[in-house]
């Protein structure tokens, strides 16, 4: 059962990383004049998809890493930071560019944290390449003269 939770957690954390790139594209398209549709896509991607995935990454961490409280806390930090990042979205009535600039900066931090979580899941699932040298019974290749 743990392996199922690891897979779900790994896929969701990886999806967060990919969706943040997509979200950056949407906001850049909006700034470049693509219209309100790009801004709506940016908002939907961030709130519904990314923030929902952040919550699920936290919840699946309980099954993926049972009783690894520091690691579960790290996934909770991803969710909390994502929530703070959403609240830093500029509102049309009041704007403080210096404060709301943290919205974009924290998106990058969320992406890095999600990548760290995905990497841990990849490692625990055994999806990384084997280290050079092979098994203990095989000798490493000899250099050519």
Residue ranges and their predicted role:
Residues 1-145:
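Polytopic transmembrane helical bundles with strong interfacial aromatic enrichment
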């Amino acid at each position: 059962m743990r392996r199922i939770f690891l897979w779900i957690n790994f896929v969701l954390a990886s999806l967060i990383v990919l969706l943040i790139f997509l979200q950056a594209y949407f906001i850049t398209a909006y700034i470049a004049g693509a219209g309100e549709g790009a801004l709506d896509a940016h908002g939907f991607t961030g709130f519904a998809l990314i923030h929902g995935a952040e919550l699920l990454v936290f919840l699946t961490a309980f099954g993926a890493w049972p009783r690894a409280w520091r690691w579960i806390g790290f996934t909770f930090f991803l969710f909390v930071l994502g929530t703070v990042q959403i609240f830093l979205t500029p509102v049309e009535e009041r704007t403080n560019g210096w404060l709301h600039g943290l919205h974009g900066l924290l998106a990058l931090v969320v992406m890095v944290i999600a990548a760290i979580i995905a990497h841990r899941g990849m490692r625990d699932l055994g999806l990384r390449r084997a280290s050079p040298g092979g098994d203990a019974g095989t000798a490493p290749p000899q250099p050519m003269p």
